[in-house]
Every structure is written in structure tokens, then in C-alpha cells.
Amino acid sequence: MIISISGFPGSGKSTIAKLLAEKLKWPRYYMGGLRREAAKKRGLTLAEYNKLGESDPSTDLEVDNYQKKLGEEKDNFIIEGRTSWHFIPHSIKIYLDVNKKAAAKRIFSHLQEENNRNEDHNLKTLEDVEKSIEERYLSDKKRYEQYFNI
């Protein structure tokens, strides 16, 4: 069994994925982490990398192929990613939604924790986070419609 977890930024995907993986004693694969690593290799923030992806499909290709391969070769795992359900269609799909203001509060609180660097922006206020979430959502939506027709 494969469980894919998707949802709006700040909806608790990572929290739920970690809890499920721990409870089931299954591995957890985090696609957001792979995208952040790829952005870092190019000297970009995740926001810049996502923006680049609107005109360069290669920014998604590595993670997309990785997800497909996982779905074909492995079983009994949790995968967390905005498009994981699409690339592993036989997975059990969980979608988490959240009010945008609540999402911004969750993310802002997370960024305030001691060990979390604000890697993507200089997000100093809740309003900055709300704006960042909206920009990310629109960028992701554009890429997903353009490249995956979803």
C-alpha cells in the first residue's frame, strides 16, 4: 500500500506524513525536500526555482520521475508532495485543506522556531507569509496546469 499526501501549503502535510510513517513504521518520502535541494544546487530559493519552473519543465522532471519510479518499484511507504497522487495513481490519496489565514499562521509560527531558516524570502510578518503562500499557490497552479493538465 502507498499513501500519498497532498494539500495546500501549511495544511499539515508533513505533520500527518511523519505521524503516519511513524505509526506504520514505513519510510516517508518528502518531495518538497527534493525540490529545495535542487533549487539550492542552482543557487536559487524555492520561490525562484518554482518561478523558473513556469518556463522550464526540467525543474519538475527530476522529482516527477523519482515519484513514478518509487510507485513502480516500492510498496508500503508514505509520499508527501503536491503532485504525488498524480504520479502514483494507485496510491491511497489524502488531501489536506486549510484556511489561508490559518495556513499563514502555521507557516509563520514554524519559521519562528529556532532551527528553521527562512530560506525562501525575508518573511518578517504574517502578511508577508500570506502573500508568499498566494504567490506559491499561483506559481504551482500554473506549472501543474501547463505540464500535467491537472
Locate predicted features:
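Conserved phosphate-donor/acceptor-positioning beta-strand/loop module used by diverse small-molecule
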Residues: 89-114, 122-125, 132
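Conserved substrate/cofactor phosphate-moiety recognition/catalytic segment
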Residues: 22-63
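Glycine-rich phosphate-binding loop used to anchor ATP phosphates in small-molecule kinases
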Residues: 55-101, 147-148
